Amino acid sequence: MKKIAVVGTGYVGLVTGTCFAETGNQVVCVDIDSKKVEKMRNGEVPIYEPHLDILFERNLKANRLSFTTNLEEGIKDAEIIFLALPTPPGEDGSADLRYILGVADDLGKLLTSYKVIVDKSTVPVGTAEKVHAAIAKHASVDFDVVSNPEFLREGFAVDDFMKPDRVVLGTSSERAEKIMEQLYKPFVRQGNPIVFMDEKSAELTKYAANAFLATKITFMNEIANFCELVGADVDKVRIGIGSDDRIGKRFLFPGIGYGGSCFPKDVQALVNSGLENQFSFEILKSVMSVNESQKTVLFPKIENFFRGNLKGKRIALWGLSFKPDTDDIREAPALYMIKALTGAGANVVAYDPEAMENVKAVIGDQITYAENEYAALKDADALLICTEWGIFRNPDFDRVKSLMKDAVIFDGRNLFEITEMNKKGFYYTSIGRKTCEK
């Protein structure tokens, strides 16, 4: 059993703290938001993540998981302190380290014995050195700084943490290495590796992984757009190239772009990190540009269908989160489509299983929010699908057709088979495939 402090209870911090408590560790989570801390003390999970609530409740009741706003109190008995703080993009797109370095500065004044400080946030290369320097400025005791990037997928974060395909640990300290290896042993019993490396390599590993996945998605979106021009079928192309082990089947599904808290921010931050070191990531610059335009790639199709006049048209929209199984709407393609549609005079009626409250907080009553997916369809001139939630994959098409004013679907996630849509009498257009005319 280790005594652990987690500073920051956002998405990464709360999953990290809860999962470490689940393996028998004593965890104190620290956050400056007193209202949030009070809610968590009372058993309220502030984010939506499948299965997190079960682990949270169990460990809160077992007193293995606790919360405080007091940093000194939170770290007092901890052997290991995780920093899970936001690194928002600055004005130039580079990662803003003020929260991490601010806490590091405070820690330097508070340390009374040896501790391992672990950077769990996604940070530019060289951040561990800056954290070490900020702590060392005030500290009178030994400490080590470790880079331990997270590789959690929203919607699968608990499973990803409990059964990681690898654990990356960046440290030059044998003492810290042994402590961290012992901490993570219960999570890699099936033989997946704990990969030790230097701090800078660990920091870059996280950025490189996200940038590669963003590039793979964007490449496939460009192939899909080209398929439409030449009459090829992106589904066939996807299967053809994905069967090659060197390429693999994952992250080859075309759509209306990536969003979320990681890919957009991390690709931009890596590009900026390159510029700071007189290096230009030309591929990643293109990835950002293509993804930005991909988010509204369906809008011209919608506009053309309605002959340039969307004023007063009622558009049902399924899916607001940037991906299924999360309530995260950061950089969600749906928001870009809403802006384009409402800007053209359309009335949008949206439904999402988890993200509607978050969207309300951002855009308020610019759109109408439906009670369920079918309620959104009433008298709709068209349906737009932006997120591939499971409940949208197999709807009652007869009911869909009866509710809508016209049987028209614009599918940004390629959920349905063209032949089936043709049989059912829908006008159906998607990404990288031929349009099904009624």
Residue ranges and their predicted role:
Residues 1-438:
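Structural/interface elements that position substrates and couple domains in central-metabolism enzymes
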